[in-house]
């Protein structure tokens, strides 16, 4: 195969891996019953005028499966952090005891579990669409090479390779979804 085709295949694989990485990151934000620092990943605190991730203004720890504690690096940030958690609207009610913020993670109801499973399916479908869009772009690039003089056989083999990559990454998305759904639905 030509160097151009190798480049297309490498960038295809890299882009598809990016879709999987994004899906895994999104799955971390979908809580599955037990407390985790990742649950607060979407919380940003107003730190002297700039939106700063919560993890950069407080130590986040998980003493047990139902509790998250936040120890601010600066005491004057307690109220600001508490307010940011409320604004983030992630279903937590923080309690400020003057030194730390304690968040009790409520157990998930059956209805909420179904909502989260549905959200996971939506994220997985978005990842599949991303993978398919990469395939479409790669096949289009291969067609351009064919018009520019690359052999038809080489282009056909490249398209088959792109399809194999696509199938492999779609399978990976499905596997990740099955694991996440099981994690969400486990009581």
Swiss-Prot record:
Pfam families recorded: RRF
Single GO BP term: translational termination
Subcellular locations according to the entry: Cytoplasm
Function recorded in the entry: Responsible for the release of ribosomes from messenger RNA at the termination of protein biosynthesis. May increase the efficiency of translation by recycling ribosomes from one round of translation to another.
Protein name: Ribosome-recycling factor
Record keywords, A-Z: Cytoplasm, Protein biosynthesis
NCBIfam families per the UniProt record, alphabetical: frr
Gene3D superfamilies in UniProt: 3.30.1360.40, Ribosome-recycling factor (1.10.132.20)
Superkingdom of the source species: Bacteria
PANTHER family (alphabetical): MITOCHONDRIAL RIBOSOME RECYCLING FACTOR PSEUDO 1, RIBOSOME RECYCLING FACTOR
């Amino acid at each position: 195969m030509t160097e151009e085709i190798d480049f297309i295949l490498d960038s295809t694989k890299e882009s598809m891996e990016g879709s999987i990485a994004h899906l895994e990151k999104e799955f971390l934000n979908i809580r599955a019953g037990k407390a985790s620092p990742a649950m607060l990943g979407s919380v940003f605190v107003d730190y002297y005028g700039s939106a700063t991730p919560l993890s950069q203004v407080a130590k986040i720890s998980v003493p047990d499966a139902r509790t998250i504690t936040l120890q601010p690096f600066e005491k004057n940030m307690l109220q600001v952090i508490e307010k940011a958690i409320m604004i983030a609207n992630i279903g937590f009610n923080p309690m400020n005891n003057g030194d730390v913020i304690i968040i009790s993670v409520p157990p998930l109801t059956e209805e909420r579990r179904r909502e989260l499973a549905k959200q996971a399916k939506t994220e997985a479908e978005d990842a599949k669409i991303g993978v398919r869009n990469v395939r479409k772009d790669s096949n289009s690039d291969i067609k351009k090479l064919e018009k520019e003089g690359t052999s038809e056989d080489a282009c056909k083999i490249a398209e088959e390779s792109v399809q194999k990559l696509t199938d492999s990454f779609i399978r990976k998305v499905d596997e990740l979804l099955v694991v996440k759904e099981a994690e969400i639905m486990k009581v």
